[in-house]
């Protein structure tokens, strides 16, 4: 998700992108996806500020809202926006955002269909737009490894790669 988000933020929205990664190969991957800056997530506030940013307008969390909550509260500008797809294990203190008038947005891909919202057709339009961006090369797939043959062996291998914590990009098993 993060790799595509980097591409969309850079190529579609035209934003300056600060990505987080700790390993050298992950940092290089983020740069290849279009990140302007890549910082180590273990010292997030310090790293972002050393990159020349005291605060930022937008933050997107794909990993762990609890782990990075204090850093996000510190780094977000007044009237900024924070988005997250992660599920907090513990409650987060939304009051910490009030003084800065920060907006917090949860995102779940299936909300429109689950609740039959009035704008449900919007999901169709979003997916069509994503397809167009892929087709015209504005954004590119993040496949980094392809395993041939849908088998128990390949499922175990793919799962092992994910569990290793060293996987970058997507792993595809071709049927």
What do the PLM-derived regions correspond to, one by one?
Residues 1-43:
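Mid-domain Rossmann-like dinucleotide-binding core that forms the NAD(H)/NADP(H) cofactor-binding site
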Residues 10, 31-32, 49-52, 73, ...:
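Non-catalytic positions within long, well-ordered alpha-helices that form the structural scaffold/packing
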Residues 18-20, 57-62, 86, 119, ...:
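Glycine- and other small-residue-rich loops at beta-strand/loop junctions that grip anionic moieties
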Residues 39-105:
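Glycine-rich cofactor phosphate-binding loops and adjacent beta1-alpha1 units
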Residues 69, 127-130, 155:
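A general structural signal for well-ordered alpha-helical segments in protein cores
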Residues 96-146:
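C-terminal substrate-binding/catalytic core of Rossmann-like NAD(P)-dependent dehydrogenases/reductases
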Residues 136-145, 156-175:
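C-terminal capping/lid region of NAD(P)-dependent oxidoreductase domains
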Residues 149-153:
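Conserved loop-to-helix N-cap of the C-terminal "lid" that shapes the substrate pocket in Rossmann-like
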């Amino acid at each position: 998700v993060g790799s595509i988000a980097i591409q969309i933020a850079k190529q579609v929205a035209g934003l300056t992108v600060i990505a987080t990664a700790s390993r050298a190969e992950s940092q290089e991957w983020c740069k290849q996806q279009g990140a302007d800056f890549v910082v180590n997530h273990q010292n997030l506030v310090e790293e972002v500020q050393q990159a020349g940013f005291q605060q930022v307008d937008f933050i997107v969390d794909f990993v762990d809202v609890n782990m990075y909550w204090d850093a996000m509260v510190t780094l977000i500008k007044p009237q900024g926006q924070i988005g997250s797809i992660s599920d907090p294990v513990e409650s987060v203190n939304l009051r910490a955002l009030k003084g800065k008038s920060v907006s917090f947005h949860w995102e779940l891909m299936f909300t429109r269909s689950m609740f039959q919202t009035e704008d449900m057709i919007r999901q169709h339009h979003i997916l069509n737009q994503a397809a167009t961006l892929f087709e015209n090369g504005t954004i590119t797939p993040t496949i980094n490894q392809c395993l041939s043959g849908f088998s128990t062996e390949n499922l175990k291998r793919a799962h092992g790669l994910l569990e290793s914590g060293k996987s970058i990009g997507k792993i595809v098993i071709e049927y």
